[in-house]
Amino acid sequence: MSRSNTKVGVMKDDYSEWLSQKALKGDLPDVFMVLPEDFSTFSSVGMLKNLDSYTKIDKAFKKSNYYEGSYDAGTYKGTQYALPYESVPTLMLVNKTLLKKEHIKMPGNHWTWDDFYKICQKVTKDTDGDGRLDQFGVYNYKWNDATLSNGGTLFNQSGTKCNLSSEPIENAILFTKKIEKISSFRNLTSDDFDSGNIAFRPMTFSEFRTYKPYPWKINKYFDFKWDCIRLPSGPDGENKTQVDNLLMGISNQTKQGDMAWQFLKKLCYETKTQQKIFQYRQGISPLKAVTNSKQAQQVLEKSMGENMTDKMKLLDELMNNALQIPKFRRYNEAYQKIDSEMTKILTDEEEFDSNILKLKQEIDKLLNQ
């Protein structure tokens, strides 16, 4: 599609604030990127155009071409306000060399919390006899990773109630505490993992791609081999993780709705454009046919210097089992409040139940202000 009078802009450092100011001045771009954390707000305040009339009438458009979770990321209260442009699933990076040294079999994609705990317990040790632990099970495994893989839903759909005291979430937090206790709540860093002293690390696929650039990995990333698998499942859940989606929408102020829709499709729906996600960005395409294509695999193999057949299957599994965060205006504020209090909850040995209940009540109050 060629339009001589079409202006194309670039992302700003303070993009969300810049876009909000544009909206206040009535000067929004016709088509713009929507960050995951902004989508609920932008939808609820009327910045984004309702796309239902286009998605349902345009015979050249089929929502079934998208991974369901990615397409649904652009839905707010039953209405489509955006299309997914790029998806970023989370996976578990595994230090295969360390596991081999400890005579531990590489876990499969359907491993459990119990498997995870036993491996972490076995590898955590003082290897040089100086009285300090120097080898560990996991870096950066968070309470929310455990919550998502244990079927926990942090909030109700309408965003009026926090489920922090529900059994799946309490058990997820207790499991995270149990995992951290193995390493005596040591404040580990990414350098510890990079040095080959940690078995596992949850990581987004975009981080994974930049972590393994070829040929730099040979001389930059030490002498351990690694692989990636799905995160372990809890007793009440499955091997599921969150998938973040960069979205694109149309301004509700646009006077060029049809042209904007064609441009939006070109960016988010056209195969040729979406193939470039693998070349020029670090995520993957939300279109099933593109992510499962030979072209995508070849691009990844060239950039990462290894056979990607198994990892392409893993990406497809992750995308088909994506978990979406709830969409309501105060989600980010409520989540950040919970996350900031979690260190205290994880390290306080005495007051777990009362701390959880108190925080739940505070969040419920925040949600209903």
Give short role names for the model-derived ranges.
Residues Y76-Y85, T90, D114-C162, I198-F200:
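Extracytoplasmic/periplasmic solute-binding protein
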Residues I119-C120, S158-N187, L231:
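Glycine-centered hinge/linker elements that transmit conformational signals in sensory
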Residues Q242, K302-L367:
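C-terminal capping/gating helix-and-loop segments adjacent to ligand/active sites or protein-protein/ligand interfaces
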Residues M1-P36:
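Early extracytoplasmic/lumenal segment of secretory-pathway proteins
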Residues W216, L246-N332:
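Mature extracytoplasmic/periplasmic domains
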Residues D52-Y66, G108-N109, T127-F136, G152-N171, ...:
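Short, solvent-exposed loop/beta-turn-alpha elements that line the ligand-binding surface or hinge
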Residues D30-M33, A199-T204, R209-Y211, F222:
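Paired acidic/hydrophobic, glycine-rich loop segments that form the ligand-binding mouth/hinge
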Residues M11, V34-P89, D223-P232:
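Hinge/lid segment of periplasmic solute-binding proteins
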